[in-house]
Amino acid sequence: MLNHNSKVWIVNYACAIDYYLDKHKQQRGVLTPGGKGINMAIVMALFGIKPTVLTFLGQPTKDLFLQLLKPYQLDLVSFPATTQTRINVKLLDGAQTTEINDVTPLIEEQAVHEMIAYLKANVKPNDLLVLNGRFLQRDLVKLLDVAFSLTKYVVLDVDEPQLLQLLNQRQPWLMKPNRDEFVAMVNANNSNVDQQELVQLIKQFQTTQNLLMSDGAQGAYFFDQQQLLFMEAIPPQQLVSTTGAGDTLLGVFLANLLLDKDPVGSLKVAVNYASATISKLAVVNSNDQIVLKATNYYYL
């Protein structure tokens, strides 16, 4: 059974250094450690959940990444990338963020085999194993194979157009796409769907045991193959950057489930923390004071 004693493992294929720049030069540039898995681990730690993040890092930017990560005291296991760790630029223009993402580093097959060997030696059947980010498809296939062989609690938040084919009938414990990703995955011929059509698509989606879908400023959906819950978003105090909001939603939701909260309670906390992330640069951390606000929810 999945519970607070379950170890959390996060495979973040290619972490990054996020460089926030103000287009109007009203504030200095800010460097933060980035990557979906890093963001998740930071917010999960706020609830006493300490994941281990596995990633690939390459010089000359590896050392800078590790220096930026040090204040968060995360458990990180890195494997060698042949080329440098990415630097992604987040250009801020009022409430708008333009992202200029560097190319994914080159990762040799030997390094992937080393990561797989580490997972096989450490992941237990009741552990939670999260794969997130963008993978080279060759490596994603291998990591999916090993993930499903090690634990029944596999969580996927990956950017892969052919994910359904790669799953090959295997059912993750949870998937977390955003609305656009979900619609493209199940209804590729028509990306323009209204809420009624979206609800029907969700209820027909049997690829995963649980679906957590973020819908931007509208809120989030959770479907467990029996009930479909919709939680309205909390309006952020201010719009600074949406970077990391989806990672926060997933990380906080999982952390609260591990602490034995029900899905409604877990999602309430998660949408509050996602809103707080939008109100600042990078994700919320231990320096932030989060006041939980009531939010509306209903079953569809």
From Swiss-Prot:
Species whose genome carries this gene: Mycoplasma pneumoniae (strain ATCC 29342 / M129 / Subtype 1) (Mycoplasmoides pneumoniae)
Catalysed transformations (reactions): beta-D-fructose 1-phosphate + ATP = beta-D-fructose 1,6-bisphosphate + ADP + H(+)
Family statement: Belongs to the carbohydrate kinase PfkB family.
EC code(s) of this entry: 2.7.1.56
Protein role: Catalyzes the ATP-dependent phosphorylation of fructose-l-phosphate to fructose-l,6-bisphosphate.
Protein name: Putative 1-phosphofructokinase
Domain of life: Bacteria
Pfam families: PfkB
Active site: D247
